Amino acid sequence: MIETREEVGSANFVSLERAIEDLRAGKFVIVVDEASREDEGDLIIAGEKITVEKMTFLLQHTTGVVCAALSQERLLSLDLPPMVKDNRCRFKTPFTVSVDAAHGVTTGVSAADRTKVVQLLADPKSKPEDFISPGHFFPLASSPGGVLKRAGHTESTVDLMELAGLQPCGVLAELVNEDYSMMRLPQILEFARKHNIAVIPVTSIIAHRMLSDRLVSKISSARLPTIYGDFTIHVYESLLEGMQHLALVKGNVAGKSNVLVRVHSECVTGDILGSKRCDCGEQLSSAMSYIAEKGTGVLVYLRGQEGRGIGLGHKVRAYALQDNGYDTVDANLAMGFPVDSREYGIGAQILVDLKLTTIKLITHNPQKYFGLQGFGLSITERVPLPVRISEDNEQYLRTKQERMGHWLDLPCCNNRVQ
């Protein structure tokens, strides 16, 4: 019997090419995301192919919150701003103001009225005056860079439309069971078989774009002698936001299999100032030392990911909250941020540019492990590093293990270092 999610998926997913052909033909496809993310399936159809009959089908089998994913440029041209200035949604779902068609509709909520607004959103000749807000339909703004920047259903939808040569407007809604609980993969696949709908994982779109798109550019390289030995340092610039990232390479890694890799998020307080609140500086030092000892490997240093993506100022505010009894998870949530908002597409592209395909990843973080796999890299082994508990970081580390699922295997408290 097939039991694991990976086995179930691989036995039932169709090719990306088949899904693209179905979209061109006006058919539905289903995109499922990672189990570590929303773990849901969205029913998707091209905006320009929508009909009242197909909208009715969407409404009957989903939450009823039907959305249209469009590029940010298109939404700007239609004068549709974000719904809120401070997006506190767990996955930063990029809603704009809700809309109805300005003319030719009744209440705006019927299948016919929603079809009308989708047709307008998909029509490149539509203008801002063709819409009114608030309404009953929810446009979503796809991130520049698509699934390589954010591996969500919004970006998957727009990327699929562009790959199919259609207008960059797709309709999507989340599949639910008859009791309105969310469909998970087994139920999604059963539904797809019943209605003859193609199912693909978001990872298939990511893998395709990883091979066809280039979102980082190497701008300089040099020899870098360090206290751990000689490395070659490469500076990469993201073509998405202009941030410059680093790759420290030990030995000849191009084309090699099972290369030792550490993808490290910038932490000024831990990496530079020696903060005892976190284990970031120790992880960085241990990883560089271990790579140097093995003689071959890569350390990717991702800038702009301070405090699991919330920025230095907010991270220090989180420290103050922790001093008043919050743990690292609740501190982020109290400030309106996700527990961990980092994405790893740029890091993956740097590794691919270094001609890596299979890696041994130095990490305790399941989100990083699965995130890098989702970006087209094959992880053949996870390499843990020793974790040292101190009085200052004990609660932080235990929270990462108990509430964030990190694979730390913490020793008991009497192994605490001073």
From Swiss-Prot:
Q: By its UniProt entry, which Pfam families does this protein fall under?
A: DHBP_synthase (PF00926), GTP_cyclohydro2 (PF00925)
Residues annotated as binding Zn(2+) are C267, C278, C280
Keyword flag Metal-binding = yes
The catalytic activity, as recorded, is:
D-ribulose 5-phosphate = (2S)-2-hydroxy-3-oxobutyl phosphate + formate + H(+); GTP + 4 H2O = 2,5-diamino-6-hydroxy-4-(5-phosphoribosylamino)-pyrimidine + formate + 2 phosphate + 3 H(+)
In terms of NCBIfam families, this protein maps to: PRK00393.1 (NF001591), PRK09311.1 (NF006803), ribA (TIGR00505), ribB (TIGR00506)
Q: What does this protein do?
A: Catalyzes the conversion of D-ribulose 5-phosphate to formate and 3,4-dihydroxy-2-butanone 4-phosphate. Catalyzes the conversion of GTP to 2,5-diamino-6-ribosylamino-4(3H)-pyrimidinone 5'-phosphate (DARP), formate and pyrophosphate.
- Which residue positions are annotated as catalytic? D340, R342
Q: What is its EC number?
A: 4.1.99.12, 3.5.4.25
Residues covered by region (GTP cyclohydrolase II): 212-418
Q: Which InterPro entries match?
A: DHBP_synth_RibB-like_a/b_dom (IPR017945), DHBP_synthase_RibB (IPR000422), GTP_cyclohydro_II (IPR032677), RibA (IPR000926), RibA-like_sf (IPR036144), Riboflavin_synth_RibBA (IPR016299)
Q: Which organism is it from?
A: Chlamydia pneumoniae (Chlamydophila pneumoniae)
Name the UniProt key words of this record, in alphabetical order: GTP-binding, Hydrolase, Lyase, Magnesium, Manganese, Metal-binding, Multifunctional enzyme, Nucleotide-binding, Riboflavin biosynthesis, Zinc
The family annotation for this protein states: In the N-terminal section; belongs to the DHBP synthase family. In the C-terminal section; belongs to the GTP cyclohydrolase II family.
Q: Which residues bind Mg(2+) 2?
A: E38, H153
UniProt-listed GO biological process terms: riboflavin biosynthetic process
Annotated positions binding D-ribulose 5-phosphate: R37, E38, D42, R150, A151, G152, H153, T154, E174
What pathway is it annotated to? Cofactor biosynthesis; riboflavin biosynthesis; 2-hydroxy-3-oxobutyl phosphate from D-ribulose 5-phosphate: step 1/1; Cofactor biosynthesis; riboflavin biosynthesis; 5-amino-6-(D-ribitylamino)uracil from GTP: step 1/4
Return the annotated region ranges for DHBP synthase.
1-211
Cofactor(s) demanded? Mg(2+); Mn(2+); Zn(2+)
A single Gene Ontology CC term: cytosol
Q: How is the cofactor bound?
A: Binds 2 divalent metal cations per subunit. Magnesium or manganese. Binds 1 zinc ion per subunit.
What is the protein name given in its UniProt record? Riboflavin biosynthesis protein RibBA
Site residues, Essential for DHBP synthase activity = H136, E174
Q: Which residues bind Mg(2+) 1?
A: E38
Task: Name one molecular function that GO assigns to this entry.
Answer: manganese ion binding
* Positions of GTP binding: R262, V263, H264, S265, E266, Q283, E306, G307, R308, T328, T363, K368
Keyword DNA-binding on entry:
no
